[in-house]
Amino acid sequence: MAELQMLLEEEIPGGRRALFDSYTNLERVADYCENNYIQSPDKQRALEETKAYTTQSLASVAYLINTLANNVLQMLDIQASQLRRMESSINHISQTVDIHKEKVARREIGILTTNKNTSRTHKIIAPANLERPVRYIRKPIDYTILDDIGHGVKVSTQNMKMGGLPRTTPPTQKPPSPPMSGKGTLGRHSPYRTLEPVRPPVVPNDYVPSPTRNMAPSQQSPVRTASVNQRNRTYSSSGSSGGSHPSSRSSSRENSGSGSVGVPIAVPTPSPPSVFPGHPVQFYSMNRPASRHTPPTIGGSLPYRRPPSITSQTSLQNQMNGGPFYNQNPVSDTPPPPPPVEEPVFDESPPPPPPPEDYEEEEAAVVEYSDPYAEEDPPWAPRAYLEKVVAIYDYTKDKEDELSFQEGAIIYVIKKNDDGWYEGVMNGVTGLFPGNYVESIMHYSE
């Protein structure tokens, strides 16, 4: 405050007086220089002296103006700071007044209200009576509670009597049919066909139960034994007088010893034989086609073969009245072969029970059949093939590039496609067929 007062009373008025004095002094200097330049004989010297006065006068005036300007700016700064302090004081007074007004308003509002006493409590309150902990009781785990849930196949254990075996139904769907490619070529480069249901096998109308026969023991039997997974078949045929050949279907059940579980063996179906009138009913092995058949000699028999797992004991049982017989479907349209050789089948001592397995619902079975191509392949068989399979269901082709076959037909597989279809040769004809309608053939010899 004293500084501002000194500026206002002393320095700023002193600067103004100095400027007025400089003004009057400059007028006198100007008159002197003019007269000196006119009267002096040395014009050059007079001119130089005039220049020196002019420069000094300009410097003096500039200094005085600068001093006065600084004093004025300093005065303005001091006044601005004082104004800020005054503004702050006024704001403080205004806030104080507002606070006082709010207090008065709250007091007036409080007069119109009543006091309420609130008790403070904890957010979590412990229960007054503690619950007794429940004792843990262990319950056994039921591993079969989810057996009927989902799309899995539930296998039921069946007590199979000797000689009886339920027929397996054919698959309801076959693999996606391959497209119709070029002329006669087999390919899978076109879109697949839609899945079509396959009709199940039907028992023929001329089904005749087998008559009761006595089984005579023999040392040799022209049959092959092979084990399959839960499917046993014995193929036989009975002749009738008058040249008629009624087809019958039978199945026999055998329990093999250890080593016969889990070996998948396909079962071929023999072709219909030709039995002359008067010949007794007899068992016989599936004959070769007429094109490769040689008349057997009476009393002769094929060498007996059995798998190594049941070399000790073999049981061939045929049921009376219920003895299942399989229908003999022809493999080709060749003439019927000559009458077969009488080959009695005998019963040996029952085999030992199978060893205990982890899976109780799967049982090993022995299938007896005679493979017509066991010794050598027919002339129409390809030189190189992947495996030889036998049809386990009847199949009728839907397109020209497929094969039609009946149960027991022998097919030589030359290619396996990724979509489940096989390419094979049957009776000299090459075509496609579903892979789930056949099973592989495995031969065992001593």
UniProtKB/Swiss-Prot annotation:
Instruction: List UniProt keywords, sorted A-Z.
Output: Cell junction, Cell projection, Coiled coil, Cytoplasm, Cytoskeleton, Neurogenesis, Phosphoprotein, SH3 domain, Synapse
The compartments listed are: Cell projection, Lamellipodium; Cell projection, Filopodium; Cytoplasm, Cytoskeleton; Cell junction, Adherens junction
| Gene3D superfamilies the record matches | 6.10.140.1620, SH3 Domains (2.30.30.40)
Tagged with keyword Ribonucleoprotein: no
Q: Mind naming one GO cellular-component term on file for this protein?
A: dendrite
| Positions where Phosphothreonine occurs in the chain | 294
Q: List, as start-end ranges, the regions of compositional bias called Pro residues.
A: 168-179, 333-342
What residue spans carry the region label Disordered? 159-366
Q: Mark the residues carrying the PTM Phosphoserine.
A: 40, 177, 221, 301
Name the PROSITE patterns on file: SH3, T_SNARE
SUPFAM superfamilies per record: SH3-domain
- PTM remark: Phosphorylated by ABL1.
The alphabetized list of GO BP terms reads: camera-type eye development; cell migration; dendrite development; learning or memory; lens fiber cell morphogenesis; neuron migration; postsynapse organization; postsynaptic actin cytoskeleton organization
Q: What's the chief localization of this chain?
A: other
Domain SH3 residue range list: 384-443
Could you tell me where the Low complexity compositional bias lies? 236-262
| Role description | Regulator of actin cytoskeleton dynamics underlying cell motility and adhesion. Functions as a component of the WAVE complex, which activates actin nucleating machinery Arp2/3 to drive lamellipodia formation. Acts as a regulator and substrate of nonreceptor tyrosine kinases ABL1 and ABL2 involved in processes linked to cell growth and differentiation. Positively regulates ABL1-mediated phosphorylation of ENAH, which is required for proper polymerization of nucleated actin filaments at the leading edge. Contributes to the regulation of actin assembly at the tips of neuron projections.
Q: How does it assemble?
A: Component of the WAVE complex composed of ABI2, CYFIP1 or CYFIP2, BRK1, NCKAP1 and WASF1/WAVE1. Within the complex, a heterodimer containing NCKAP1 and CYFIP1 interacts with a heterotrimer formed by WASF1/WAVE1, ABI2 and BRK1. CYFIP2 binds to activated RAC1 which causes the complex to dissociate, releasing activated WASF1. Interacts (via SH3 domain) with ABL1 and ABL2.
What is recorded about the protein's domains? Answer: The SH3 domain is critical for binding to ABL1 and ABL2.
* Protein family membership: Belongs to the ABI family.
| Alphabetized PANTHER family for the sequence | ABL INTERACTOR 2, ABL INTERACTOR FAMILY MEMBER
Protein's UniProt name: Abl interactor 2
**Organism of this sequence:** Mus musculus (Mouse)
